[in-house]
Amino acid sequence: MSGIIATYLIHDDSHNLEKKAEQIAIGLTIGSWTHLPHLLQEQLKQHKGNVIHIEALDEQEHINSYLGKKVSRGLIKIHYPSLNFSPDLPAILTTTFGKLSLDGEIKLIDLTFSDELKKQFPGPKFGIEGIRNLLQVQDRPLLMSIFKGMIGRNIGYLKTQLRDQAIGGVDIVKDDEILFENSLTPLIKRIESGKEVLQSVYETYGHKTLYAVNLTGRTYDLKENAKRAVVAGADILLFNVFSYGLDVLQALVEDDEIPIPIMAHPAVSGAYSSSKLYGFSSPLLLGKLLRYAGADFSLFPSPYGNVALEKEEALLITAALTEEDHYFKKSFSVPSAGIHPGFVPFILRDFGKDVVINAGGGIHGHPNGAQGGGKAFRAAIEATLQGKPLHEVDEINLHSALQIWGNPSHEVKL
């Protein structure tokens, strides 16, 4: 079936899911149906949205209480013909959820693209396998850390932070998403200084680290800024996708003059996906759509930290990023926020080896600094892969980390 199928979670105070579904299908396509002359119906039939599935769900009293009324809940699926929209995300999202998103009681759970439609999207340029090949790391999760406290600091401070994190065994260091173009640490200077530091660490310690630099600026300047970054030697671009739009991400990915991986940050996405009643589902927004548009990495709140996402949601995001699809490479999951070494066994148990463990305070807050923090994480990763409990590991940096943040994983089994 060509076109796209949208799955919605609806809350209906008229208690007629069939009628509500049909209203949506008609309202987002031809506008009306039953009052049209037969000849016009025949002409418009190929453009009409069609309800293909309705599933009633159990009533939930806490939702009724929140809404201040009794509602029927249900999942509905509607097919939208490809004749109705151009094969791009702005058209697809407007068709399936444009004015409907203003309802306030409908959540877009999923979009199922036809094979023909999938061909219009690039998917990740590198994907999990390509990123692993860049780092020459095949047998373990990747470790990522974050520059902290860079606003108002100079290049010397950045170089010191970067060096310590790289020596600690971190695979990727990323800019803070709130670090924009500025006179103290301008984009090109960050890239050039970063390359100098990371090359020195590689020559001395034999460990390769990549630097994800924040791509910022006005939308019409982004491509030029990205190309300047590439010429300067950037390894990875960090991109605040939802501040700009998914289509902007796709445009960057499809540009052959920007041949480096792109890491999608979830900033602003909470405004679209946090509610259980309306907006986008997290697996759709932070999983499927980011992968289709071309993100090599997707950051999202972990189920364990201080900005936690429900575990089921986080795992569904990962499934959308990594499920087999011969049209698209797999994207790296990056569960983030509040991660310390004691959580490593949880992460590997829940997400497997094809994951990026992302830590900020869990590395910089270590008593031996970022070097000690990185080494603690690497020791935790190695021990977990060997099936060894963290409290039995004879590594001083990991021991210190567990004393500070605890070891909630002492009973976790892979």
UniProtKB/Swiss-Prot annotation:
Substrate binds at residues 148, 174-177, 265, 338, 360-361. InterPro entries: Diketo-Methiopentyl-P_enolase, RuBisCO, RuBisCO_lsu_C, RuBisCO_lsu_C_sf, RuBisCO_lsu_fd_N, RuBisCO_lsu_N_sf. The active site is at residue 99. The keyword Phosphoprotein does not apply. Catalyzes the enolization of 2,3-diketo-5-methylthiopentyl-1-phosphate (DK-MTP-1-P) into 2-hydroxy-3-keto-5-methylthiopentenyl-1-phosphate (HK-MTPenyl-1-P). Has no RuBP-carboxylation activity. Pathway: Amino-acid biosynthesis; L-methionine biosynthesis via salvage pathway; L-methionine from S-methyl-5-thio-alpha-D-ribose 1-phosphate: step 3/6. Binds 1 Mg(2+) ion per subunit. Transmembrane segments: none annotated. Its cofactor is Mg(2+). Homodimer. The gene is mtnW. SUPFAM superfamilies: RuBisCo, C-terminal domain, RuBisCO, large subunit, small (N-terminal) domain. The modification N6-carboxylysine is found at residue 174. The lineage of its organism: Bacteria, Bacillati, Bacillota, Bacilli, Bacillales. One of its GO terms (biological process) is carbon fixation. This is 2,3-diketo-5-methylthiopentyl-1-phosphate enolase. Belongs to the RuBisCO large chain family. Type IV subfamily. Pfam families: RuBisCO_large, RuBisCO_large_N. It catalyses: 5-methylsulfanyl-2,3-dioxopentyl phosphate = 2-hydroxy-5-methylsulfanyl-3-oxopent-1-enyl phosphate.
